[in-house]
């Protein structure tokens, strides 16, 4: 079973349920080596996945700063684009591209020291200028959707590269959630500054042919608009992922996805939008397939009240309902 390899590939896929076909989709060198370690290194691991997105929007959403399409696609973005920060397994914010950071006394200026020696997938060096432009480009490219991923993008006053590896982020007011929102690859994934026009709009034609990030994978083209292919980033600065490449097949119907998995066309499905509870229960009992439900998920759910309702317009009623909910259950 390749569940560990799958997990190593999709570092951003924090989804509720997943199904995986057991066995291998590996290409091996026809000349067998006497050394088992060399044989293992000769294997090329490829995964086939399936999603329901409207891929006519894919090339815009693959740009981190543009968010006018499916939220599901954002799960893949950290495979291509690193962020300044991320959450560790304990839910704490830790640096990724940011090596060190500080905040001014008034809480309106953050200073980030950027790690050195990191390259984009096109081989160019990551510098503070790339980080500053990526941040400034967020509200420009989000446009009418600015603020849809959090408040930070609405209070950016400026982002300045003060030297080759130092960035200052200036806000119009203090904001407690700044570092947490900088963990989001959409919209705060770091992109090569060469991929923005002078007005900071993204060069969409460039993103039709490549991804320009520092993440473990990069875009490798599509097959007639039905399958999108991704391979390892040869310039990746971190530990090389165990999966060499993966493809995302466009299969809009969930039953067709399950059939494709049974036929060996798809290796992995994840998320409740791709796998119904009934299909999950069925495949969990089927030989040759692995099933896993995440025990932890970094998501927020809320219940909103319709204040125009005669019942819920009464604050006492709302407080009574809120008090009756066991929040520790």
Cite the ranges covered by each PLM segment.
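Surface-exposed binding/hinge segments that line
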Residues: 148-196
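Aromatic- and charge-enriched surface segment that lines or borders ligand/interaction sites
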Residues: 99-144, 168, 260, 311-313
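Extracellular/periplasmic solute-recognition and catalytic clefts
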Residues: 160, 220-231, 247-309, 319, ...
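Short, low-complexity disordered leader/linker segments with a strong preference
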Residues: 1-46, 92, 103, 151, ...
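Alpha-helical secondary-structure segments
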Residues: 127-134, 164-170, 215-216, 243-245, ...
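Gly/Pro-rich hinge or "lid" segments in bacterial periplasmic/extracellular proteins
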Residues: 71, 88, 184-241, 245
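N-terminal lobe/hinge region of extracytoplasmic solute-binding protein
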Residues: 50-103, 136, 212-213
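Short, well-ordered beta-strand elements
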Residues: 43-54, 109-112, 131-135, 167-169, ...
């Amino acid at each position: 079973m390749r569940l560990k390899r799958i997990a190593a590939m999709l570092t951003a896929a924090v989804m509720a349920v997943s199904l995986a076909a057991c066995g291998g989709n590996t290409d091996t060198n026809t000349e067998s080596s006497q050394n088992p370690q060399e044989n293992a290194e000769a294997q090329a691991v490829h995964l086939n996945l399936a999603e329901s997105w409207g891929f006519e929007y894919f090339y815009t959403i693959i740009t981190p700063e543009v968010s006018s399409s499916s939220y599901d696609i954002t799960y893949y973005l950290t495979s291509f684009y690193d962020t300044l920060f991320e959450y560790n397994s304990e839910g704490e914010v830790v640096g990724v591209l940011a090596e060190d950071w500080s905040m001014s006394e008034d809480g309106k200026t953050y200073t980030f020291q950027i790690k050195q020696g990191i390259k984009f997938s096109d081989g160019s060096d990551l510098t503070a200028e790339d980080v500053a432009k990526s941040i400034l480009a967020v509200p420009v490219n989000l446009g009418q959707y600015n603020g849809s991923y959090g408040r930070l993008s609405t209070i950016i006053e400026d982002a300045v590269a003060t030297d080759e590896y130092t960035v200052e982020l200036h806000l119009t007011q203090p904001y407690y959630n700044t570092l947490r929102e900088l963990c989001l690859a959409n919209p705060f994934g770091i992109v090569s500054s060469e991929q923005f026009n002078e007005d900071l709009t993204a060069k969409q034609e460039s993103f039709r042919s490549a991804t320009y990030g520092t993440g473990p994978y990069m875009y490798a083209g599509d097959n007639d608009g039905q399958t999108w292919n991704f391979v390892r980033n040869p310039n990746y600065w971190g530990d090389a992922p165990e999966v060499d490449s993966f493809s995302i097949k466009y299969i809009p119907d969930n039953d067709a996805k399950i059939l494709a998995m049974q036929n060996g066309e798809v290796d992995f499905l994840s998320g409740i939008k791709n796998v119904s509870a009934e299909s999950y229960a069925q495949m969990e009992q089927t030989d040759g397939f692995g099933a896993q439900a995440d025990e932890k998920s970094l998501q927020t759910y809320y219940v909103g009240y319709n204040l125009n309702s005669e019942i819920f317009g009464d604050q006492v009623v709302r407080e009574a309902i809120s008090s009756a909910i066991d929040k520790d259950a």
